[in-house]
Regions:
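Short beta-strand segments
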Residues: 69, 87, 107-109, 139-142, ...
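Thiamine diphosphate
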Residues: 12-101, 246, 251, 259-260, ...
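Active-site cofactor/cluster-binding pocket
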Residues: 1-255
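Short glycine-rich or small-residue beta-strand-to-loop segments that form or flank ligand, phosphate
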Residues: 13-20, 169-171, 259-262, 309-312, ...
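A glycine-rich phosphate-binding loop feature that marks nucleotide/adenosyl-phosphate handling sites
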Residues: 49-50, 188, 205, 226-230, ...
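Gly-rich Lys/Arg/Thr-decorated short loops/hinges at beta-loop-alpha junctions or inter-strand turns
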Residues: 51, 149-151, 218-233, 251-258, ...
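Short gly/pro/ser/thr-enriched loop/turn and capping motifs at secondary-structure boundaries
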Residues: 50-54, 113-117, 146, 293-295, ...
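Flexible, low-complexity linker and terminal segments
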Residues: 238-247, 255, 385, 390-613
Length: 613
């Protein structure tokens, strides 16, 4: 680095990598995130890409982005406006104009400017010279040509050389933030093991980008974000889907029940299935079924045999699984259903996030078929939510739906790997061999749960199925009084789970003028917006719900004592409707967004300020 570059310390930074779907922006963002983790920063990421595998190149609709928000203090959100934009073509600038703050550094591949590229992006003239970007710091670099120049002696064709241009851009950004290149080198060596030429080519381009930024003095300042004050422990960069997979494995180990996953690939939940297939050595059985129904039915069968059973899906698949979920309710078998929500209805927006499956999760089954519903609040938190879903399912002999979403599942955060000894115990109610008083639907008095009778255990022969059962004995029954009793017992069993979950916390003054209510993946942005207004002296508090069905038993106390209540969610008000149904005496305002994008801190603060007037 030249002596002329001044190193400026920053509290936090938001970087957005943006280009065509084939430009490798997801990989570039992930590699920078890995370097961020090794630098000791706290961070959160937001991948944003089209639903098409190869959308039209050079168009705004085809832009793929990856945002990283990192800092030396706790980071709860993926960031609103970006401080640095890496734009690989004109369409990337067009697509991201609304995410730029005054003074944003735009690192732009000047080789991408052609008449056709400008036309596809909707520009009449080059935005880097016509004044469109006058409020920003535009750093133009001939990234494509310099990539080819760096690889001229490798005997590669033009198309192959340009596949590495994202590494040139990454090199520039690594220089800008004073990052060591070792983490990227290590990735090359692992990813391309045995392909020395490929490793050398990528290293060459990465180095070329780094040294170009240095030699040509592209930046007046470079930047450094000091390491966050993190608790001692082992950390890694983890996505929500991988965190969920790990949480399931931890629950399996803790409970002593083998893990079985029966699932069908669906965006954005597939990575859970893909991750669990790697752990056959840990007695994980992952079965890729031919469809959604086969996936959940295989899991119900596995639960019957004593496995910790799981199925994963997204909104359309949850609809297909509805009848089978009713079977799991009727048989009272432990089952975890993970729904990584996406934009709907129907096929909807497969790669975009939404929270619109809540009412389906609560009520989307025929008959009165209650089950437990909980929601993850962060990518790293998916580990603990999956673990808790498995604990409740096995200890209370019930299906549990865990709600995540695309931004949590694909986004990543710093994750401190916990010690098994620090995780809550999981003790399933296993039936004992040769129990002379055993009956399939005999229940304990405290939780109303039936015992888990593992097939093959002496003296525990029994039948299960979808027809109504006689209380206690478990025989088929169409008796009206018995059906009334069994329906009430199944409902009360779920209600009693409220005695086994934490009380609802409220952040801030319990009698604040405005109570902000949220659930699921909106936690980070809502909490950050509330904290900002608290610092201004505003009378505001925040209640974020992780447990949906049943609600925490002190929920009504939390809702009391406020002039206004506003429920923030990425749907048209489903949790607000649910609260009104359970607590009709409390008036809830709504703040909803259904654009396939998370809330921004700015729009939340504007809404809260308006309600506080």
């Amino acid at each position: 680095m030249t002596a002329k570059s001044k190193v400026v310390a920053l509290e936090h930074v938001v970087i957005r990598f943006s280009g065509d779907s084939g430009d490798g922006m997801q990989l570039t963002g992930n590699l920078f995130s890995d370097s961020t983790a090794f630098a000791g920063n706290d961070f959160a990421t937001f991948p944003d890409y089209p639903a098409e595998i190869r959308p039209p190149q050079g168009t705004v609709a085809g832009v793929s982005g990856f945002q990283v928000h990192f800092g030396h203090k706790p980071v709860h959100t993926t960031g609103d406006l970006c401080d640095v934009l890496v734009a690989m073509n004109p369409a990337s600038i067009k697509a991201n104009m609304r995410w730029l703050r005054p003074g944003t550094i735009i690192i732009f591949d000047s080789d991408s400017v052609t008449e056709k590229a400008l036309e596809k992006a909707g520009y009449a003239d080059d935005p880097t010279v016509d004044g469109t970007l006058a409020d920003y710091q535009v750093v133009k670099a001939p990234i494509s040509e310099l990539t080819k120049e760096a690889l001229k002696d490798f005997g590669m064709d033009n198309k192959s050389m340009l596949k590495s241009k994202n590494m040139f851009a990454l090199g520039i950004v690594m220089y800008l933030f004073n990052r060591e290149l070792d983490t990227v080198y290590k990735y090359f060596e692992t990813k391309f093991k045995g392909k020395d030429q490929v490793i050398k080519a990528n290293r060459t381009v990465l180095d070329a980008g780094y040294h170009y930024a240095d030699t040509w003095e592209l930046f007046t300042n470079t930047y450094r974000v000091e390491a966050a004050d993190l608790d001692k422990g082992k950390y890694r960069n983890i996505t929500g889907n991988i965190a969920a997979a790990w949480g399931l494995m931890a629950a399996s180990e803790k409970s002593g029940r083998p893990l079985f996953l029966g699932s069908y690939p669906i965006t954005p939940a597939t990575d859970i299935l893909a991750e669990l297939t790697k752990y056959k050595n840990l007695n994980v059985k992952a079965y890729q079924a031919e469809d959604e129904i086969a996936g959940i039915m295989s899991s119900i069968g596995a639960a019957y045999t004593g496995c910790m059973a799981v199925t994963t899906t997204s909104g359309p698949g949850l609809s297909l699984k509805s009848e089978a979920m009713g079977l799991a309710v009727m048989t009272e078998l432990p089952l975890v259903i993970i729904d990584v929500q996406r934009g709907g209805p129907s096929t909807g927006l497969p790669t975009k996030m939404e929270q619109s499956d809540l009412l389906q999760a609560l009520y989307g089954r025929n008959g009165d078929a209650p089950l437990v519903v909980i929601a993850a609040r962060s990518s790293a938190g998916c580990f603990y939510t999956a673990y808790e879903a498995a604990r409740i399912a096995m200890e209370h002999m019930t299906p549990v739906i865990m709600l995540s979403d695309g931004s949590l599942g694909n986004g990543s955060e710093v994750f401190r790997i916990p010690k098994m000894a620090d995780l809550p115990s999981i003790t399933p109610p296993l039936a004992k061999a040769n129990d002379p008083d055993y009956m399939p639907y005999r229940r304990d008095e405290k939780w109303l749960r039936r015992e888990w009778a593992i097939p093959g255990t002496p003296g525990l022969r029994h039948r299960v199925g979808g027809l109504e059962k006689e209380n206690g004995k478990g025989n088929l029954s169409t008796n009206p009084e018995n059906h009334q009793l069994m329906t009430e017992l199944r409902e009360e069993k779920i209600n009693r789970v409220a005695n086994d979950i934490p009380l609802q916390e409220i952040y801030g003054d319990k009698n604040a003028d405005l109570l902000v209510v949220s659930w699921g993946g909106t936690f980070g942005t809502v909490r950050t917006a509330v904290e900002g207004l608290m610092e201004e002296g505003k009378s505001i508090a925040h209640a974020h719900f992780d447990y949906i069905m049943p609600l925490p038993r002190n929920t009504e106390e939390v809702l009391q004592g406020h002039k206004k209540i506003v429920v923030c969610e990425i749907n048209r008000g489903q949790f607000a409707k649910y609260l009104r149904m359970n607590f009709p005496e409390y008036k809830c305002e709504q703040f909803n967004k259904v654009m396939g994008l998370p809330f921004t801190i700015g729009e939340l603060e504007a809404k809260f300020n308006d309600l506080l007037k």
